[in-house]
Amino acid sequence: MALAAIILFTGALLAAWLLRPVTVAGPCVVVSGPAFIRELTESSGLAVSRRNPGLLWSHNDSGSAAVLFALDTTGVVRARIPLPIRTRDWEDVSAARCSSGDCLYVADIGDNDSARRQVQIYRVPEPAVGDAQTAPPEVFNATYVDGPHNAEAMFVVDADAFIITRDRAAAIYRATLTPSADRAITFQRVGELGLGAVTDAETSRDGTSVVVRTSHEAVLYRTADLIRGVTTPYFRIRIDGLREPQGEGVALDGNMLYLSSEGRAGSRAGRLISLRCELPR
């Protein structure tokens, strides 16, 4: 075979290898990403939009403006929704049904020193991407029954919010989001996952599953089980092979799993990876 032909053949093999779907622990393949999102240097929470098909919601971590970003699955920012509130340590965003239809819940629950007397959860009607803003948020001041905790993960089912602490126990706390102008709601401990440092949790778009992530795995639970305190997962996906700079967010829509990461020194843009997974029914 001529040298030129060998070079062409080798180049074609290399290109095919580079463009191949990347397998993640068997059940998942990367179908897009990592996409680089310059406005999300500290992408923290992630949620699948219920009102805008094909879009995700995310936000930056502490020290940033109170803005929700609508992204498509390639990482392009399609909308920016500012909220008229002050941020302390935003850690998560969740999408769920509410009395007015579909709502977004922002969890200002970060507490690295476990010293905050109260944390805050904000609820707003989920806007259409064409809307420049949404209604003023409802504010839920909250405490834990056993004192302050650092947490980065929250999911919402009906009128109840569930917070998972960022410690070895990964304890789950539950409270009903009842507005009150004069007193805080109290989160009660209902169980623990024992996963270590949980950075995000979210219900699937159809509401049947809850996905919880750490730096090295995404763990799936049946929603009906988890809200009753049954903490046995039905599926686990290893994700540490993706080499995210600092993996943070997770969202699930059918068989699509989405992961977000903060940027790294020298390239501050956040990352978004989309995976297609073969999940048990």
What are these regions (language model features)?
Residues M1-I7:
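N-terminal Sec-pathway targeting helices
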Residues L3, L13-R281:
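Sequence/structural signature of beta-propeller domains
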